[in-house]
């Protein structure tokens, strides 16, 4: 891929396999990097934070770089339970539903406020600040077999035809293994994400019981605050408490087969 050496090169690093592979290959191929941006939701797996720390120690510091952490000043749970709703139409709709005019509730398919407020907005704001002083190029780690690219962004993995499977192997080959996180979960997004698979949630309960207990508490609070509405539903088909009962029953049944 062609590189503009006069530009300011900003790399987005989520910490996942694709963005990590992109960063590794950019460094190996001698591509310029001026900033590495990380949007922290505050709800990542502990192994992901350890991985990001390792990336900074092993890859960035010796090159005079560091992670630029981007965080919402209030955080995920404040947005979920406490953020005031100002728009009149929103307040009227909530009045009809009988829910308070604060808190976003669980993210939904149509309204993924978490991605918007905790990731996209923060990164775009930072990149726009950079663009006020520099001609900036923004690099995103999307694999060749993922969704289509957007305009005005740089997608090295697509240009290099690197698939998701290849991206993960690139990381493994260079000693970045997330302490086995990708062997447990196909995708390593926020541990509280309601869009993850049932199998992922079952794995969360088994391998991260402290996070599972936190998720139970969040869902109980959401149901109490927002009731039987989309805002109060972790998933359309299950509450976390119901999933907890289901997984417990499945584990007990499996234990009987193993006897």
Predicted segment positions?
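Nucleotide-activated chemistry modules centered on ATP-dependent adenylation/adenylyltransferase
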Residues: 1-259
